Amino acid sequence: MDKRILLPTDFSKNALNAIRYALDLYQDQVCEFYFLNAYQVNGYSIDTMMMFPEPGEPSYEAAKKASEGGFEKLMDILELHNDNPKHTFHTLSTFNSLLYAIKDTIAKNDINIVVMGTKGETGAASVVFGTNTVNVMEKVTECPVLAVPEVVRFVKPKEIVFPTDYKSVFKRKELNYLIEIAKYHNAFIRVLHIVRESDLSHEQQANKELLEAILKDTSHSYHTLTDHKVPAGISAFIESRDSDMIAFINKKHNFFGSMLSKPLVKEMGYHSKIPVLTMHEVSQ
């Protein structure tokens, strides 16, 4: 079955970079790429109670025309980058907020994964992803989200870091995309545990053994760092090994339970300099 990949775009350079990354990541796979531009009209917002323009009104039609014109230019650019018979392109323009447009497109087209990239709006060098991307990483739970920093240029992933505290029971379905990407690119999965004490509880050990069973057909290894704050420890590990991607399972309320005072997806999402694959907890 073809893989269906959603690529949100605002026609910026960082969005184009994420698109190119996705095309290269899935270069040899049969894929349908859905390019999505969610547009609004200046002074109006889907997220407020304000009345907003309807089809036929000048401001609405101008925004729609700009979106469609952006896609014409984008397709011209992509023809130069990617003349791949295995890839099929679809363009979608919609008057909606980004988050709702993504959720609607996932539902209507049975999307397998979202790939997007954006830089921080603040202009601060330390802020890699903007709030839109982090919001999608947290709130789009229907499928995995791969967020690509603007500074990243595609290289075939050779190593994917998977941080865990071993406190939750692993489910194969949660890890499908991590395993798929690792197998497809012959990448190693580096399972990283950051703790104050290196000893695992009986429950943690059982969960680690379950993870071993799930990862048994992949190349993987286990690593432990002690006396590190989690985000800093992850960053240090990645930088020391020149890893190519990081993958998380986003728990319903908070990454790693009580290990953090705020969700790790925000901490790593704002500051990561490599692609972040956010997978989601499966209840059953």
Feature names for model-found ranges:
Residues 1-56, 159-224, 243-245, 271, ...:
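Small/aliphatic-rich secondary-structure junction motif
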Residues 15, 95, 126, 171, ...:
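A conditional alpha-helix N-cap/helix-loop micro-motif detector
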Residues 54-69:
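A short acidic, glycine-rich active-site loop
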Residues 80-90, 216-221:
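A short helix-to-beta-strand connector/capping loop
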